[in-house]
Regions:
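A bilobed periplasmic-binding-protein/Venus flytrap-type ligand-binding module shared by bacterial periplasmic
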Residues: 119-127, 220-231
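N-terminal winged-helix
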Residues: 16, 23, 28-76, 232-235
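Basic, amphipathic "hinge/linker" alpha-helix immediately C-terminal to the N-terminal HTH DNA-binding motif
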Residues: 1-17
Length: 254
């Protein structure tokens, strides 16, 4: 119920304040500080998390990262299950998502703007193209991440989510999607900011060539936090890690 959700949100907020007091005044003991991130399916968000965690003694912390549905990213940060969420805005979804963020008492912080890319297997028939148009993709399965039976197009992680595709396959995780790219010659439309260290070198991001009916949309990637909240030390380090990775790895991607 709405009352139950609101109670859970305030309970977590109070507990978070309690944890902050314990962290500040406790000496020794076995208390573990907690930090969580919820994100759309971005390998760069996971890589930034890995780089951040390596700076800490993991025996003193309880870390969590959740690659999940867009609605869950928003819900997790709103209920303080995660301190930071990572998602994108576009001309298509901006108004709807900002309304959802506002109602959840969250705010969006800009990280980077990028165009959409076609992400596919290195041995895909279109792998040698300089750019790929919508018509060239027609004969191949379009892959997308599941967002739930009742989700709207605005929660999709891919651009052109309202288009009619002759063949579509949905996946719930990145590993399955990569397998589908190989097994079905499938593709997805994504930011093009891919962490090869995590996804492997068998996949390519090729510029998507938009046309009048199927325009390439700017994707504004950012992170969300609770409104008027102050990021913890770990939260600030994670955001810094995100910014550093994006600065170092978007020259070739854009």
């Amino acid at each position: 119920t709405n009352d139950g959700t609101e109670f859970l949100m305030y309970a977590r907020q109070i507990y978070g304040q309690y944890e902050s007091v314990v962290e500040k005044y406790s000496e020794g003991g076995s208390y573990k500080k907690k930090f969580g991130v919820s994100t759309q399916h971005y390998s760069f968000a996971v890589k930034a998390f890995v780089d951040m965690v390596q700076k800490f003694d993991v025996s003193e912390y309880e870390f969590a990262i959740r690659e999940t549905k867009t609605a869950d990213v928003i819900s997790d940060v709103s209920t303080m299950k995660s301190e930071v969420g990572v998602l994108y805005l576009s001309d298509f979804n901006r108004k709807a998502l900002l309304k959802l963020l506002h109602s959840a008492n969250l705010e969006f912080h800009h990280l980077i703007d990028c165009q959409a890319y076609v992400y596919l297997w290195k041995n895909h028939p279109l792998a040698n193209e300089k750019s790929i148009s919508y018509s060239q993709l027609a004969k191949y399965p379009c892959l997308s991440f599941e967002q739930g039976d009742k989700s709207s197009f605005y929660l999709s992680e891919e651009i052109l989510s309202t288009n009619e595709y002759s063949r579509t396959v949905k996946a719930s995780d990145r590993a399955t999607m990569l397998n589908l790219m190989v097994g079905l010659n499938g593709y997805t439309l994504c930011s093009g900011i891919i962490c090869e260290e995590l996804n492997g070198s068998d996949y390519l991001a090729i510029p998507f060539e938009g046309d009048e009916q199927n325009q390439n949309s700017d994707m504004e990637i950012g992170y969300i936090t609770r409104k008027n909240s102050i990021l913890s030390k770990v939260g600030n380090l994670y955001v810094s890690s995100l910014k550093k990775y994006l600065e170092q790895n978007t020259v070739s991607a854009e």
